[in-house]
């Protein structure tokens, strides 16, 4: 039997329903792959093998009877931000040591109701704060992609018997992999690595400023951040409540559409979830885009953008034009203010949300001589450096002397960013095409990034506007850089028009193809 982990969700779904394979077989294949690869990649922080086998067995029983949901028997990885009843849920933070919730997040409950199988919990940046998956208490996730290089190899002169001439030697070039470890992006780095390295069929993720789309672009996978309110946030550990949104990371556009259909729902437990029908996103794939108006924002041509990113963008424009779309130049004038405004709003909300972690009822507790010292010691030991930095920023901008100067101004900028998009869509633009990231994946422990947090924050330059405006955005693989690393393009849509994103992303995918890392782990 061929490697079952190589099947896409749509392929596995067909084989499961056709009784060509069983849920138990494909689940065991993934558990074996995780066992072999996770020591090298660190994608999973908890593997739920026994639960996965029980869920697969139950799926097989339903499939035998011709029953089963939309994801029956499909093995998935779950980002450690999603509450999973009785299972490790720590947001990859020391402060939540040993926490196993008594509840199930709405998104994961939807997946289990549709028959999905849980393989385990995936690594991530601590409390989803990061763009490289290096802030996790459990250590960095390793990108399964590596840079490749051309080596010149000297060929020996060889002879055969009695001086018979075979080869005159000389040189030849061959491509080989660099050993340098790369980041998978963040905060959903474990999700992206697990999908890219065939350690799950698909994964849940969350996106507050680009945490689905940037890792997807860095790993050659597809990631969609749906419209704010499309998926329930109930049971998901909060970072910035007005920006957080759950979505899937998958191997191709169709798989992402299948997953989002199951993840999305209205939820009375989340007042920000929106009560509107969830469409059949998969049905949008393959529809022509002839006559669709695609906007190209001039403000996304940033200083110092690498040539390969601009070239990729132009290639994407050509693909959509060739498919019959009308390309129009647009302006989103407040784009340049999005990143500084985001890094005021998000930390402000985080400082409020993270105030609840005090060591009293659950998680880490470091004793002190009184309750105040216990709070101080617990939070000092429990939170990592980046989380502390953002709590301090948030507390500062919310303080009495600076609230008007920073937080209030940032919220005004947010409204202007939202209005920019509204004006463009009102003018008839159907979808906006931009790069997903300003570069390909960079190295683990990059000295420039470590020395200047702002450089790390700039990884979100193309993605934060989408969160600030509450819009849907999808990252789709579109090519490789000169060193063989994946690059992605981003599509931004009107509110609740994820179908248009899937429809357009499928055109890019068909033109660009799909990308898989060369296995080294």
Curated annotation (Swiss-Prot):
Documented EC number(s): 6.3.5.7
Domain of life: Bacteria
Catalytic residue list: 79, 187, 211
Coiled coil segments of this chain: none
Any GO molecular function: ATP binding
Catalytic activity: L-glutamyl-tRNA(Gln) + L-glutamine + ATP + H2O = L-glutaminyl-tRNA(Gln) + L-glutamate + ADP + phosphate + H(+)
A GO BP annotation: translation
GO cellular component: glutamyl-tRNA(Gln) amidotransferase complex
InterPro entries assigned to the protein according to its UniProt record, in alphabetical order: Amidase, Amidase_CS, Amidase_dom, AS_sf, GatA
UniProt keywords, alphabetically: ATP-binding, Ligase, Nucleotide-binding, Protein biosynthesis
Subunit structure: Heterotrimer of A, B and C subunits.
Annotated function: Allows the formation of correctly charged Gln-tRNA(Gln) through the transamidation of misacylated Glu-tRNA(Gln) in organisms which lack glutaminyl-tRNA synthetase. The reaction takes place in the presence of glutamine and ATP through an activated gamma-phospho-Glu-tRNA(Gln).
Membership in a protein family: Belongs to the amidase family. GatA subfamily.
Protein name in UniProt: Glutamyl-tRNA(Gln) amidotransferase subunit A
Organism: Mesorhizobium japonicum (strain LMG 29417 / CECT 9101 / MAFF 303099)
Lineage: Bacteria, Pseudomonadati, Pseudomonadota, Alphaproteobacteria, Hyphomicrobiales
